[in-house]
Amino acid sequence: MSKVQEVIDIVKQMTVLELSELVKALEEEFGVSAAAPVAVAAAPAAGAVAEAVEEQYEFDVILTSSGEKKINVIKVVREITGLGLKEAKTLVDECPNPVKEKITKEEANEIKAKIEEAGGSVEVK
């Protein structure tokens, strides 16, 4: 039987308390920490997940308020969406409503600028 197998057999017979003492003794003897590699390995993975969540490729433009210049906002909404007068008026009257969904950031910012210029309030999500 090899030395490695002998150590494994001894470890199998130890209690949890004895194993804990063994780990502490090994850490002191060799100047290492059993917890360090796990923490170091987990940190970059968590950071990568957070970065992936933060990146967004599709945006929704939500009209939150028509402001005082409702007619101008209706005109801009019609231009952007291609809706008829009645549908655009309903969309503007019943805020908050999505004007356009699943669009690029650039397009969302252009639409936001147009609606705000007309007097409305917009939120990009």
UniProtKB/Swiss-Prot annotation:
CDD domains: Ribosomal_L7_L12 (cd00387)
Gene3D superfamilies (UniProt xref): 3.30.1390.10, Single helix bin
Keywords per UniProt: Ribonucleoprotein, Ribosomal protein
One cellular-component annotation, GO: cytosolic large ribosomal subunit
InterPro entries per UniProt: Ribosomal_bL12, Ribosomal_bL12_C, Ribosomal_bL12_C/ClpS-like, Ribosomal_bL12_oligo, Ribosomal_bL12_oligo_N_sf
Single GO term (MF): mRNA binding
Pfam families hit by this protein: Ribosomal_L12, Ribosomal_L12_N
Superkingdom, natural source: Bacteria
Any GO BP: translation
Signal peptide start and end residues: none
SUPFAM superfamilies, per the entry: ClpS-like (SSF54736), Ribosomal protein L7/12, oligomerisation (N-terminal) domain (SSF48300)
Protein family (similarity comment): Belongs to the bacterial ribosomal protein bL12 family.
General function of this protein: Forms part of the ribosomal stalk which helps the ribosome interact with GTP-bound translation factors. Is thus essential for accurate translation.
Assembly information from the UniProt record: Homodimer. Part of the ribosomal stalk of the 50S ribosomal subunit. Forms a multimeric L10(L12)X complex, where L10 forms an elongated spine to which 2 to 4 L12 dimers bind in a sequential fashion. Binds GTP-bound translation factors.
HAMAP family for the chain: Ribosomal_bL12
NCBIfam families for the chain: L12
Protein name, UniProt field: Large ribosomal subunit protein bL12
Gene: rplL
